């Protein structure tokens, strides 16, 4: 009983079903209205600067380049710390 009532409402409310275009256009317009607009960032807005107005990303690249192989990533550092804890707890020599 509910299905014929809904179908009848769609036919009268949104246009005829024989064309099909009215329903499709309305749905696509609704979907377009729900899409968020893209945020456009300029390069100056996307990058942060320190107190001396120097680009932090460029400074970090220079620091890492100077350190060379001595620089450790966060994952490598945490793995190293975990290995040291296991050695202390288990009093076992392990290859880190």
Curated annotation (Swiss-Prot):
Annotated spans, Disordered: 28-57
Species of provenance: Conus ermineus (Agate cone)
Modified residues (4-carboxyglutamate): 75-76, 82, 86, 95
Localization per record: Secreted
Tissue expression pattern: Expressed by the venom duct.
Entry protein name: Conantokin-E
Disulfide bonds: 83-96
Alphabetized InterPro entries for the sequence: Conantokin_CS
């Amino acid at each position: 009983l509910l299905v014929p009532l809904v179908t009848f409402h769609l036919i009268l409310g949104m246009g005829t079903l024989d064309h099909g275009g009215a329903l499709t256009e309305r749905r696509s317009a609704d979907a377009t209205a729900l899409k968020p607009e893209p945020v456009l960032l300029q390069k100056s807005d996307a990058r942060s600067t320190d107190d001396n107005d120097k680009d932090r990303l460029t400074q970090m690249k220079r620091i890492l380049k100077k350190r060379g192989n001595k620089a450790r990533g966060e994952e490598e550092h945490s793995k190293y710390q975990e290995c040291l804890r296991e050695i202390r707890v288990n009093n076992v020599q392990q290859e880190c």
